[in-house]
């Protein structure tokens, strides 16, 4: 077979930078899916992307489909011919549809009977004739939430399309994508190199764009250049650049020919909290801040321009001029905000509604304050400090800085609290109350921070469920799933002795008459159980292990975690499979018993050696198991119970549980119930697979 390399490029106006990678990855993925459906082999595929182009190359693409034979089964012989051996209408219709006569059909014999058969030879189609339609389908499936139209065309895409190039080796693939005909024309950089040029071969795409068009279409190469040059530029001024990957990706998606430059701002702005300056530089201007080795912000920033200038200082001065007013605004807001304390802003929180049925933010912070103090008492933290932090937790929402830079809520509260003379624990708690903010974020560990973060989330969860607005489907406007995961993670990772039932009840009590859903507490607890499952699945824990623990519905997160670890360890033991099966058998037997089960085991009614041995083994273990379960040492307890395997196996081999003698039967059921209860102290291991 013959092979060639394929290039497809769609030249557009500037694409959304935050979507560029996803669009490019989806484009090539959709196309390779089409190739596989068409049974066209290839060696590899690589996406390319720049602000004004989506492209990919497919290496060693076969030039035609392979010929193949397709078996087309017809009617069974009994239905294909009548009693006189003449073809029926069914047989003739099938043959006509396949372009043959009934006499030309073969016979297919199987164990189930005999059928007419036609082995049709299907000649493979040239790849070139399939490419256009496959590329169009790949584009149609791109994740574009808001497509747009341009000109007089009815075609829709994420941005207007100007060029389309499809080359199979050196051959132009005729066709049209998004209303634009395929041609060899490739557009270069807007301001450097050739405005456009013709590409002679798919293999020359990247090199021709770089040399003639002054465009680096290799996304990863462009990103690597920016990262390397920015690190070098920061080191040159004695600092370290903050090259957060999300911003690095966005900047990579904004430039075709990256040139890294260093600029400065006045040192006086360093009196403003660094987070505000960084927020402005990164969020508004797409600049990389520079820190010293101690983590202190330096009066420099690194930025990436899309052009090689004969006088870079002009570009540097321009960027310094642009950022200065933004930093001056931050300075003004900070100086203005300092004139009022966080406590003095509490009254203004009365004017802001948190949620119509749940009251104002002032009422919310009063609830958070009381709940944080309650939690503090439960974990031996300072209740007064926790209550104080809860009370001040939302005051920074009324500051100029947070109104302008909303993502700084909490962070600015910390800075203002320090200026107001609050304790460091209170100040830090204001900053950490929203943690964890996203998957993978750290959780607060300082006691006061823990109390406020838990109270803040529990107030929201219980309140929103309490007015009947639980999340439905994918919709979660109050981010309750994130809040619930946050509560669980804070409790788990700090090993806190807290119970969800107690926390929910206290939060519900503090909401008072605001709540109209009388099943709120039950629903919130069930919601937490669902988050337990989601969280542990994300951590790679087997579903059957999670279900085994969920069956016991432990409501203390730290206890839940201990059980998960213990059952996961038990599952790895050699005895686990047999004991899980035995527990399932016991569960089924006990479920069929009518009336109340006996709880006392009579030694006089133990007549078989196997039941005597099992009872004796259980009696030996119980004094060891009781303190282990009391201390939540489930792993050691289950390891001891694993030693019962042989006794349990022998019992089921030698003993008839449902004996005719009622007394013997009830005694054996009591023995099995006792066995199962020991395992149920940890989990329902009958659910292990």
Curated annotation (Swiss-Prot):
Recorded hits in Pfam families, A to Z, give:
DALR_1, tRNA_synt_2f
Instruction: Write down the chemical reaction(s) this protein catalyses.
Output: tRNA(Gly) + glycine + ATP = glycyl-tRNA(Gly) + AMP + diphosphate
Task: Report the locations given in the UniProt record.
Answer: Cytoplasm
From its record, what is one biological process in GO terms?
glycyl-tRNA aminoacylation
Key words of the record: Aminoacyl-tRNA synthetase, ATP-binding, Cytoplasm, Ligase, Nucleotide-binding, Protein biosynthesis
**Which interval of the chain is the signal sequence?**
none
A single GO cellular-component term from the record reads: cytosol
**One MF term in GO for this entry?**
arginine-tRNA ligase activity
Which EC number(s) does UniProt give?
A: 6.1.1.14
Q: How is this protein organized at the quaternary level? A: Tetramer of two alpha and two beta subunits.
HAMAP family annotated for this entry? Answer: Gly_tRNA_synth_beta
What PANTHER family does its record include? GLYCINE--TRNA LIGASE, CHLOROPLASTIC_MITOCHONDRIAL 2 (PTHR30075:SF2), GLYCYL-TRNA SYNTHETASE (PTHR30075)
Name this polypeptide is given? Glycine--tRNA ligase beta subunit
What does UniProt list as this organism's lineage?
Answer: Bacteria, Pseudomonadati, Pseudomonadota, Gammaproteobacteria, Alteromonadales
The gene behind this protein is glyS
């Amino acid at each position: 077979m013959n092979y060639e390399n394929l290039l497809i490029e769609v030249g557009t106006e500037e694409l959304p930078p935050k979507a560029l990678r996803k669009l490019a990855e989806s484009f090539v993925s959709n196309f390779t899916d089409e190739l596989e459906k068409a049974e066209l082999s290839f060696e590899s595929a690589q996406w390319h992307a720049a602000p004004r182009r989506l492209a990919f190359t497919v290496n060693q693409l076969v030039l035609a489909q392979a010929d193949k034979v397709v078996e087309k089964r017809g009617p069974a012989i009994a239905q294909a011919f009548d009693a006189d051996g003449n073809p029926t209408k069914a047989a003739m219709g099938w043959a006509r549809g396949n372009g043959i006569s009934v006499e030309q059909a073969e016979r297919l014999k199987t164990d189930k009977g005999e059928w007419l058969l036609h082995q049709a030879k299907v000649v493979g189609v040239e790849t070139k004739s399939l490419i256009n339609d496959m590329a169009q389908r790949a584009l149609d499936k791109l994740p574009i939430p808001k497509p747009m139209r341009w000109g007089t065309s009815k075609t829709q895409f994420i941005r207007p399309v100007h060029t389309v190039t499809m080359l199979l080796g050196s051959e132009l693939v005729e066709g049209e994508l998004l209303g634009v005909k395929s041609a060899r024309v490739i557009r270069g950089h807007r301001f450097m190199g050739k405005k456009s040029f013709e590409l002679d071969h798919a293999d020359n795409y990247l090199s021709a764009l770089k040399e003639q068009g002054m465009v680096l279409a290799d996304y990863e190469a462009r990103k690597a250049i920016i990262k390397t040059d920015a690190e070098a530029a920061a080191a040159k001024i004695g600092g370290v650049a903050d090259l957060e990957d999300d911003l690095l990706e966005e900047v990579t998606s904004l430039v075709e020919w990256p040139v890294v430059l260093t600029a400065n701002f006045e040192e006086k702005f360093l009196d403003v909290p660094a987070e505000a300056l960084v927020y402005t530089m990164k969020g508004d201007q797409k600049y990389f801040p520079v820190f010293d080795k101690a983590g202190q912000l330096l009066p420099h920033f690194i930025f990436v321009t899309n052009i090689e200038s004969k006088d870079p200082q002009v570009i540097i001065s321009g960027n310094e001029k642009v950022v200065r007013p933004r930093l001056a605004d931050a300075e003004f807001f900070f100086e203005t905000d300092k004139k009022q304390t966080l406590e003095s802003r509490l009254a203004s929180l009365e004017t802001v509604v948190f949620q119509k049925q749940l009251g104002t933010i002032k009422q919310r912070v009063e609830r958070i304050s009381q709940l944080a103090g309650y939690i503090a008492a439960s974990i031996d933290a300072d209740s007064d400090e926790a209550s104080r932090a809860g009370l001040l937790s939302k005051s920074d929402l009324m500051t100029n800085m947070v109104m302008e830079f909303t993502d700084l809520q909490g962070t600015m509260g910390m800075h203002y609290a320090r200026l107001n003379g609050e304790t460091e624990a209170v100040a830090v708690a204001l900053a950490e109350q929203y943690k964890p903010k996203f998957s993978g974020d750290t959780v607060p560990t300082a006691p006061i921070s823990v109390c406020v973060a838990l109270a803040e989330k529990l107030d929201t969860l219980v309140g929103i469920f309490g007015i009947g607005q639980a999340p439905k489907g994918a919709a979660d406007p109050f981010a309750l799933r994130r809040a619930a995961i946050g509560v669980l993670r804070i409790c788990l990772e700090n090993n806190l002795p807290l119970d969800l039932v107690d926390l929910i009840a206290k939060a519900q009590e503090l909401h008072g008459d605001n709540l109209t859903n009388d099943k709120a507490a039950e629903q919130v607890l069930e919601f937490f159980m669902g988050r337990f499952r989601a969280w542990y699945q994300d951590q790679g824990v087997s579903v059957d292990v999670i279900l085994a623990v969920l069956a016991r519905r432990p409501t203390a997160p730290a206890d839940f975690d201990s059980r998960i670890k213990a059952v996961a360890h038990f599952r790895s033991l050699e005895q686990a499979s047999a004991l899980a099966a035995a527990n399932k058998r016991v569960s089924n037997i006990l479920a069929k018993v009518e009336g109340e089960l006996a709880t006392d085991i009579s030694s006089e009614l133990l007549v078989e050696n196997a039941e005597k041995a099992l009872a004796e083994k259980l009696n030996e273990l119980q004094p060891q198991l009781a303190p282990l379960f009391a201390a939540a040492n489930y792993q050691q307890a289950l390891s001891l119970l694993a030693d019962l395997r042989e006794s349990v196996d022998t019992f089921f081999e030698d003993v008839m549980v449902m004996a005719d003698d009622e007394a013997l039967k009830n005694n054996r059921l009591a023995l099995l119930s006792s066995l199962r209860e020991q395992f149920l102290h940890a989990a329902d291991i009958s659910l292990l697979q």
